[in-house]
Amino acid sequence: MIGIIFNTYALYKIFCYEQFGFKKNQFIIFLVFNLLSSVIVFAYIFSCGLLYCLPYILCAFWLSGVAYADYVSCNVYEIMEYYAVIPILLSILNIINNGTSYALPKLGAALVTVAAYGIMAKAGVFGEGDSDILSAVCIVYFDAYYNCIFFGLVMVLFVIRNFGYAVKNRVMHGNVRPLVPSIYMGYILMLPFVLGSTPES
């Protein structure tokens, strides 16, 4: 409930904050475009019987909007970071309601892992956006082998991100924000769902 109240207040600040002007409108248009695209994807998934992966594809669309906001305004990006938790909650609810192949102990372990990702993100091991993507995917692919791969990918992307900031500071003189590939890794992790794989029973 506290999280819902905080996110509602954050949404109010985003849409009522006039400082961003035209750039803020660009971000809103881009986000609406992503949401409309997700409706099309929803129709396709429903016809193919792959409804369970909808929240994760929505997560990819949502974080792509966050990535765009990163280039529009740091302030918007910092606020929108907290919104990535919404697809994760949808994913958990989807599993509880429809994921008959998930045992409760497995779901509990997945939730613990999600919390661990969040704590590590706050500790600065990797970005909060990375934590959100990994948490959502981990709920489906909760396996030690996949987790090791995820941690390895995140650590590599963490190095790339810091290298990007170094390039920005030395070459771009702070005028252009570097590409943060860790957010876009969500699309790579969504491929198994798009290709029609199913969670293990």
Predicted segments with their positions:
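A membrane-topology feature that recognizes alpha-helical transmembrane segments
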Residues: M1-S201
